[in-house]
From Swiss-Prot:
NAD(+) binds at residues 74-75, 148-149, 178, 186, 189-194, 244. Involved in the regulation of the intracellular balance of NAD and NADP, and is a key enzyme in the biosynthesis of NADP. Catalyzes specifically the phosphorylation on 2'-hydroxyl of the adenosine moiety of NAD to yield NADP. The keyword Nucleotide-binding applies. Its EC number is 2.7.1.23. Its cofactor is a divalent metal cation. It is an enzyme of class 2 (transferase). InterPro entries: ATP-NAD_kinase_N, ATP-NAD_kinase_PpnK-typ_C, NAD/diacylglycerol_kinase_sf, NADK. This is NAD kinase. It is found in: Cytoplasm. Keywords: ATP-binding, Cytoplasm, Kinase, NAD, NADP, Nucleotide-binding, Transferase. GO terms for biological process: NAD metabolic process; NADP biosynthetic process. It catalyses: NAD(+) + ATP = ADP + NADP(+) + H(+). Gene3D superfamilies: Probable inorganic polyphosphate/atp-NAD kinase, domain 1, Probable inorganic polyphosphate/atp-NAD kinase, domain 2.
Length: 286
């Protein structure tokens, strides 16, 4: 993954917007700003039906772009981060709506950001993703990445989930309840937080197991280190990656999850303050 970005030689920047929302006005403003620096803005083909700008499929967009802008909310950025890992490209999150935990500023603030960016005034953070290995009954292994979390929940919401967790073939824990969240530090402020899981600093090399509505008062979230791989077994349950990809657990004989060696480069303003964002979003202090 990129350790730095050569801000002096940026030629092409890709842009992907939140789906099913017209952001043509915001796109044109970004194009106008980037043209000052002789940088071409290219679009994901589904980001605009009207604008006369170069458009590409997602894979081609990543191939030709020096980095990619996510214009939308945290959900838009999360899906892009998994793709960014494939192409070793960085992602910049600009929010179109409410401030997110991952998207730093609005389009109205983009001019100031890029003025600083092209002078080398920015920072790169590289949060780790989860690796998910799904082995089917024929022994074929499907490897997936999760930026935020992997959630195991009951297929039939009227019944209780029974989830067993193993490490090195020894039972590590057993959960009865509505489900189980396996979250990254970046995802600790998402569903994990709603389930009373801990907030873990984004760049920590760890992941979190958080039970959802456990039927036992003694079950509590636990933070596990990088290198600690778990195997999850549960019948009649659904495994969901980042709220976007669903798999029936009955279709697989083995599902293993752990913190990946892969991370994604996120571009931030130099003065970004993670704890100030927490304070604003969670209404800490005055």
């Amino acid at each position: 993954m990129q350790n730095k970005i050569d801000h002096k030689n940026i030629k092409t920047i890709g842009l992907v917007t939140r789906p099913n929302v017209s952001l043509d006005k915001e796109i044109l403003k970004l194009q106008s700003i980037l043209s000052i620096y002789k940088v071409e803005l290219v679009l994901f083909k589904e980001s605009s039906e009207i604008l006369d700008l170069p458009k590409y499929g997602l894979d081609d967009l990543f191939k030709i772009s020096d980095f990619v802008i996510s214009l939308g909310g945290d959900g838009t950025l999360i899906s892009l981060c998994r793709k960014a890992c494939e192409y070793d490209k960085a992602v910049l999150g600009i929010h179109a709506g409410h401030l997110g935990f991952l998207t730093d500023f609005k389009v109205d603030e983009a001019e100031n950001f890029f003025q600083a960016f092209f002078q080398g005034e920015f920072r790169i953070e590289k949060p780790y993703l989860l690796s998910v290995f799904l082995e089917d009954k024929q022994g074929k292994i499907l490897e997936k990445l999760a930026f935020n979390d992997v959630v195991i929940s009951k297929n039939n919401q009227a019944s209780m989930a029974h989830i067993e967790v193993f490490r090195k073939e020894k039972k590590f824990n057993e959960y009865f309840g509505d489900g189980l969240i396996v979250a990254t530090p970046a995802g600790s402020t998402a569903y994990n937080l709603s389930a009373n899981g801990p907030i873990v600093y984004t760049l920590a090399q760890a992941f979190i197991l958080t039970p959802v509505c456990s039927h036992s008062l003694t079950q509590r979230p636990i933070v596990l280190p990088k290198g600690f791989e778990i195997e999850i077994m549960a019948k009649d349950c659904i495994l969901c990656i980042d709220g976007q990809e669903n798999y029936k657990m009955n279709d697989f004989k083995s599902i293993k999850v752990g913190l990946s060696d892969k991370n994604v480069a996120l571009i931030h303003p130099k003065n970004r303050d993670y704890f100030q964002i927490l304070k604003e979003k969670l209404h800490w202090g005055n």
